[in-house]
């Protein structure tokens, strides 16, 4: 087994060298994203900026071995696939890249197990993550000098069992956009726009930017900025993230951070902040935020 690990480590290093400093993420059209559900392992490339590819960190071979056992079971008898763990059946999250193929964003250990097992193809989900140039374009198109930031998964999306949610979309859209918005989000976003705020939503998860934008359109909720895949590490030696943060501060001297428990106002000019607690009642969450912002406007 140790010899196999060393062999894979060399293969991984060779694959990283093939793409490091060369690859460029490019947009994948809707047809490609809908039709491409599997791809060959030859078209998949490890992400040089992921810890999986760092020589001092690298793969967790215990995890890889667990996936290998499950993949071998599938190869031996496809009927056994129903007994395989959901994680093993989960598609790899990938981005289309130039010059060729797809960059793995999530699922390196499954990719490694598939390679070591000799699988020819593996399920994939193609996403268009927010790129640095997308953020520049959204900043240029934004119309206000104040912004509100919210976390998609922690604040905006609501699992019905956890609290009140907006009504599901009509068929067939409910089968495409499965996420439910928290009750009051469309009304809150409209209120924020009327009062001179650009709404920016963020997520560490690997959602396609256009998927999120279209989801909000279905609910008649406008957002100025969408940033997905924030868990990604910046390329080595890149100062772009710091530059974009500085540009954000220049564009928006005042920012409101909204979460489940409070509204926090941050003034980058005076370097001051103020916190406005919320009651925690999901039924009145959006109205309480409107009241907080209305109070700020009155104090001016």
Where are these regions (language model features)?
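C-terminal cap/substrate-recognition subdomain and adjoining C-terminal extension
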Residues: 207-300
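Well-ordered, non-membrane alpha-helical segments in soluble/globular domains
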Residues: 61-79, 178-188, 209, 286-289
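A short acidic-Thr-Gly-centered motif at the start of a beta-strand
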Residues: 90-99, 138-142, 247-249
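Alpha-helical substrate-recognition element adjacent to the catalytic core
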Residues: 58, 142-234
């Amino acid at each position: 087994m140790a010899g196999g690990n060393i062999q894979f480590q060399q293969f991984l290093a060779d694959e990283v060298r093939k793409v490091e400093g060369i690859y460029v993420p490019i947009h994948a059209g809707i047809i490609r994203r809908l039709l491409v559900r599997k791809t060959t392992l030859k078209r998949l490339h490890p992400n040089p900026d992921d810890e999986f590819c760092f020589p001092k960190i690298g793969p967790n071979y215990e995890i890889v071995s667990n996936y290998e056992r499950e993949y071998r079971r599938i190869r031996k008898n496809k009927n056994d696939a129903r007994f395989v763990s959901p994680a093993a059946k989960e598609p790899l999250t990938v981005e289309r890249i130039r010059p060729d193929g797809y960059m793995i964003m999530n699922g390196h250990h499954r990719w490694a197990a598939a390679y070591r097992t000799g699988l020819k193809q593996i399920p994939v989900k193609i996403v268009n993550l927010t790129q640095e140039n997308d953020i520049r374009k959204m900043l240029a198109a934004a119309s206000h000098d104040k912004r509100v930031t919210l976390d998609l998964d922690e604040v905006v999306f609501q699992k019905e069992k956890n609290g009140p949610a907006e009504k599901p979309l009509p068929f067939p859209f409910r089968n495409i956009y499965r996420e439910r918005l928290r009750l009051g989000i469309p009304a809150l976003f409209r209120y924020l726009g009327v009062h001179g705020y650009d709404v920016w939503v963020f997520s560490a998860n690997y959602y396609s930017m256009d998927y999120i934008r279209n989801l909000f359109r279905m609910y008649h909720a406008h957002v100025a900025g969408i940033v997905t895949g924030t868990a990604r590490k910046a390329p080595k030696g890149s100062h772009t993230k710091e530059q974009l943060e500085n540009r954000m501060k220049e564009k928006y001297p005042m920012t409101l951070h909204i979460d489940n428990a409070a509204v926090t106002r941050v003034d980058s000019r005076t370097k001051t902040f103020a916190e406005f607690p919320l009651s925690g009642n999901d039924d009145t969450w959006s109205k309480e935020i409107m009241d907080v912002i209305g109070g700020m406007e009155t104090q001016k």
